[in-house]
Curated annotation (Swiss-Prot):
Domain topic, free-text comment: Has 3 domains, the large (RuvB-L) and small ATPase (RuvB-S) domains and the C-terminal head (RuvB-H) domain. The head domain binds DNA, while the ATPase domains jointly bind ATP, ADP or are empty depending on the state of the subunit in the translocation cycle. During a single DNA translocation step the structure of each domain remains the same, but their relative positions change.
Binding site for ATP: 26-27, 68, 71-73, 134-136, 177, 187, 224
Chain sites annotated for binding DNA: 316, 321
UniProt key word DNA damage: yes
Species per Swiss-Prot/TrEMBL record: Lacticaseibacillus paracasei (strain ATCC 334 / BCRC 17002 / CCUG 31169 / CIP 107868 / KCTC 3260 / NRRL B-441) (Lactobacillus paracasei)
BP term (GO), one: DNA recombination
Gene: ruvB
Spans annotated as Head domain (RuvB-H): 261-338
Protein name: Holliday junction branch migration complex subunit RuvB
Domain of life: Bacteria
GO molecular function, one term: four-way junction helicase activity
Pfam families: AAA_lid_4 (PF17864), RuvB_C (PF05491), RuvB_N (PF05496)
Region called Small ATPAse domain (RuvB-S), residue ranges: 188-258
């Protein structure tokens, strides 16, 4: 992932450890406090209740969708609802089988192991997970050379929760071992507005309903973006001595931050303008777009495209990406003129 993307206000990624700490303070602890994702919440409530009634560990859970939609938060909520401990890590952090063994060895019956970016697990680690997930054991090779021999190591029943922004990169054997698979969708403006108001209360910040809704409307359907914009708007409001924050203050702050009426920032607009100006809207190959706006192809696919596709400003074709008539109109142009 390009480091530059983490500096974007409208990026779904966590930009630094300070933001991670702030996110932690804003997180709900139980499903009843978790705003949005109603379908996912309802199904998880059923699965969790059933597992508790049977006194069994919850089936393994895969959460997938764009960054910033609350996958990590939901994993923590699941552990709280189950009343068990949770160990959190990420795919890149588990570099070798010994790292996985150390994590599994710390689990007690019913505990949750959460692996973020699970699509980035090394292949040798992923293969060790198969027996751990399916039959709750791992085989460890002890010794070296002629004396090396496998040792059967039983594990307590546990729940693996994997999170990914790239579900298509998961191997079929790993994906098939998740009994519960839930897609995290973009949030509605109404749900995001409730999140903004809840966060404002935690920040001890007054904001009116119109102001909260305007932040929600420009937050790209993403709670992390909504909270990040709220923090920056709070700065502008405090310097201006304005309380409560109203829609005029929100408009002023977001104009200064170059976040437009649809939640696009200067990089989104640069991407669209390049395609319109140099290729009459496309089709344009992903590698060409990446080279001209100075980003990696994976960053464009994961960070920029999903929202532009979601709001209908961009479409994918077999020959490349194309700007839609709505995308032309947003940039103040007509597709018929190109």
């Amino acid at each position: 992932m390009a480091d530059a993307d983490k500096d974007r206000l409208v990026s779904g990624d966590v930009d630094d450890s300070n933001e991670a700490q702030i996110e932690k303070s804003l997180r709900p602890r139980m499903l009843a406090q978790y705003i949005g994702q109603d379908r996912v919440k309802h199904q998880l409530e059923v699965y969790i209740t059933a597992a508790k009634q049977r006194e069994e560990s919850l089936d393994h859970v895969l959460l997938y969708g764009p960054p910033g939609l609350g996958k990590t938060t939901l994993a923590l909520v699941i552990a709280n609802e189950l009343g068990v401990n949770i160990r959190t890590t990420s795919g890149p952090a588990i570099e070798k089988p010994g790292d996985l063994v150390a994590l599994l060895n710390e689990l007690h019956p019913g505990d949750v192991l959460f692996i973020d970016e699970i699509h980035r697990l090394p292949k040798i680690v992923e293969e060790m997970l198969y027996s751990a997930m399916e039959d709750f054991y791992i085989d460890i090779v002890v010794g070296q050379g002629p004396t090396a021999h496998p040792v059967h190591f039983p594990l307590p029943p546990f729940t693996l929760i994997g999170a990914t922004t790239r579900a298509g990169m998961l191997s079929a054997p790993l994906r098939d071992r998740f009994g519960i698979s839930e897609h995290m969708a973009y949030y509605s403006a109404d749900d995001l507005s409730e999140i903004v108001k809840r966060s404002a209360t935690i920040f001890d910040m007054a904001i009116d309903a119109e102001g909260a809704h305007e932040i929600a409307r420009r937050s790209r359907g993403t709670p992390r973006v909504a909270n990040r914009l709220l923090k920056r708007i709070r700065d502008f409001a405090e310097v201006a001595g304005q309380s409560p924050v109203d829609i005029q203050m929100v408009d002023h702050a977001l104009d200064q931050l170059q976040v437009d009426q649809q939640g696009l920032d200067q990089i989104d607009r640069k991407l669209l303008m390049f395609m319109i100006r140099d290729y009459e809207g496309g089709p344009v190959g992903l590698s060409t777009i990446a080279a001209n706006i100075g980003e990696e192809m994976a960053t464009i696919e994961e960070m920029y495209e999903p929202y532009l596709l979601q709001i209908g400003y961009l479409k994918r074709t077999p020959r490349g990406r194309m700007v839609t008539p709505a995308g032309f109109a947003h940039m103040g142009m007509s597709a018929e003129q190109h």
